[in-house]
């Protein structure tokens, strides 16, 4: 079992290198601005003592006023984990793709795109993975029905 890192402590490290990247944090997670996602992800992956080299999973959540993309990260070397979140508007739901950093994000980003309609900018093959091409809408959205 991995040791979860305190979100507030990691947020301080992020802010020390990437000012204005952190939107909110607590003991369990860090929410960052979408424009900073790639820079923060690379920082978390390459910084000594953090080295989050493994992306466990990505999920999407449809809240009343926004979408949230949640990244569950693990450092195999240090046996610790972190929950990283990014929020985007429902009117223009898009965040940068992290496939260039964690190849395992490929199908997970496609799933979130297919079922929630969040666009992952820079994804090398962003197309539906469960629903057929031409399917109208995104079935896990609150407003689907």
What are these regions (language model features)?
Residues 1-145:
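Terminal low-complexity/charged segments
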